[in-house]
Amino acid sequence: MADKPNTMTVEQAADEAAALRQTLNEWRRQYYDEDAPNVEDSVYDQKYERLVELEQTFPQLVTPDSPTQLVGGTVKAGFDKVTHEIPMLSLGDVFSQAELQEFVDRLEQNVGHPVDYNCELKIDGLALSLRYEDGVLVQGSTRGNGTVGEDITANIKTIKSIPQRLTRPLTIDVRGECYMPKAAFAALNERREAAGEPVFANPRNAAAGTLRQLDSRVVAERQLSTFMYNIADYEPLTARTQSDMLTEFADLGFAINPDFKVAHSMADVFSYIDHYQNERPELAYGIDGIVIKANPLPLQRSLGATVKVPRWAIAFKFPPDEQPTLLKDVEWTVGRTGVVTPTAVMEPVQLAGTTVARASLHNPDYVAAKDVRIGDTVLLHKAGDIIPEISSVDLAKRPKDAQPLVIPTTCPSCGAPLVHLEDEVALRCINPKCPAQVQEGLVHFASRNAMNIDGLGPRIIAQLYANRLVSDVAGLYRLTKAQLLTLDKIKDKSAEKLLTAIDRSRDNSLERLLFGLGIRHVGAKVARLIAQHFGTIEALMAASQEEIAAIDSMGDVIANAVVQYFESDEVHTLIRELQAVNVNTTYQGPSATVAEDSNSWFAGKRVVLTGKLESFTRPDATQWLQAHGATVMGSVSKKTDLVIAGSDAGSKLQKAQQLDITVWDEARFSETMREDAQA
């Protein structure tokens, strides 16, 4: 345990403070400038609080480069600098209800009366400033070091939640948080891991890394969102409280987090904290605490700020939800693109409301950095409240005979040599006949966003492949009822149901087939753009790299991947076989040249889908809504116009009812779609 500062000499304190500054500044550089932290927040906070303690006891030790005097990071090369006329400050932190009570007591003693507080969720993202002149968006910037940030205007203009024009012609500088929703983060990491690229540690890093992309097309693809919560200068607004300011923001067209609450007592504040500490895993985005702000705006102005933090607000940081467990094994598995991924197998533990027994170790570089070994006691947490991740190893409990993990040199599925492709951190099997890759490819082909063959999952596909009934996707369409009845747990009715689902998938539009084929870098959105442009698979197969790259500024990486895929003789044979079994290879959706239906009732509406839909898939419903001019949102807020609720709808439906938002059941939505088709 560290010595108490009041028992130390100045020299001892100076030595420790210097070491802490060096360590903390290096961690800050990794966090802010590289978007790649190498230490848990709780460890950083512990070191930071120790430095604060030393500097408070020995004020002469405070230096201009101390992390206690700095805000954010440096300005990254490649972006123009933006000077914030009014600095973008960070927040002070507390870690216990007792510390929070002390902050409130000091504030109220200072002003001489009790204060109402606005409680807001602390979004785990990247601070953002948006500048509007006469109601028009003219600039977006990062916080940077608080005084000078990065001009990311081109990137933020691709984010759907940021209005290009306000509902009033105000000249304002609005601050908020840019974040990546949990679902978008999980999908992005899945794509990166499949492509052999380094994964992001958490949604905050993913959002920061995305906003700092020099190619704004990448930003557009990654589904970032924002919540705005503050303003540089209160004057342009009519609001007199923090809570009313958020409502005014929403009226201006900004996305705000609707889950704020005005607290009239500390009992209200603590109740809010307890509620969202429990609800945290259920939210669609990551939070790492609660922000408590004095609600009256005139009081905020009179209290002002220190060089680093406002005096009228504080962040209550949630304690890390970590559990120790035993690492029993490491399994190496092969994905559909050939990437070989290590997975830690552990004693099951309860973490953030779920039982966790497995965690990805991503790639050999990650394994080496963590130095995990069989038999280790490890600390497990959920990165961004989503993905189980080993945060550290308890070296004191490491068995004496524990050995470093052996990185495989041959494929665990087919035995082919593993390779490192250029610019990849992943190990990859490049044998196209690898059984694991073939099976994973079949699973992907049948998945909901691809050919949507209901009932054809990994268990049945494994049996079909093992029994040599299917060796490629075309073989699915040659299956017979007699063959299906030879499989385990397949009876007469389920065989007929599966054959019906397979038969129905023959009529899917071309974009589903393209996505289902598993072409590298071709996700569902890219597949739709390509299908819209070319119309038929024959036209696509004859297209040049330049033609494909020019589609909606798609670029060379995707175009090269598509061209290389269709250069294969085996792929040509597969396409002919699919056509021979009557699988559709033409595009059947709305034309790329036809604008969204501006005359539709849905035009301009913000719609949320929730619950289980029986008549159609969620992607199909989303595509239909978008084609009719709607914006499909991931969460319910005061700005939501309509919620379409299937069966087993949960918190989104409840929130819609609380906010008095129009709710349709699936039957009404289906009827609307049918009427539109007949019109």
Swiss-Prot record:
Alphabetical list of Pfam families matching this protein: BRCT, DNA_ligase_aden, DNA_ligase_OB, DNA_ligase_ZBD, HHH_2
GO MF, any single term: metal ion binding
EC category name: ligase
Entry EC number(s): 6.5.1.2
Cofactor requirements of the protein: Mg(2+); Mn(2+)
Tagged with keyword Zinc: yes
Gene3D superfamilies hit by this protein: 5' to 3' exonuclease, C-terminal subdomain, 6.20.10.30, BRCT domain, DNA ligase/mRNA capping enzyme, Helix hairpin bin, Nucleic acid-binding proteins
Sorted UniProt keywords: DNA damage, DNA repair, DNA replication, Ligase, Magnesium, Manganese, Metal-binding, NAD, Zinc
Reactions accelerated catalytically: NAD(+) + (deoxyribonucleotide)n-3'-hydroxyl + 5'-phospho-(deoxyribonucleotide)m = (deoxyribonucleotide)n+m + AMP + beta-nicotinamide D-nucleotide
Residue positions of the active site: 122 (n6-amp-lysine intermediate)
Keyword Transcription regulation: no
Chain residues that bind NAD(+): 41-45, 90-91, 120, 143, 177, 293, 317
Binding, Zn(2+): 411, 414, 429, 434
Record domain BRCT: where: 597-679
CDD domains: BRCT_DNA_ligase_like, LIGANc
Annotated Gene Ontology cellular component terms: cytosol
GO biological process: DNA repair; DNA replication
Family as reported in the entry's similarity comment: Belongs to the NAD-dependent DNA ligase family. LigA subfamily.
Function field: DNA ligase that catalyzes the formation of phosphodiester linkages between 5'-phosphoryl and 3'-hydroxyl groups in double-stranded DNA using NAD as a coenzyme and as the energy source for the reaction. It is essential for DNA replication and repair of damaged DNA.
Protein name: DNA ligase
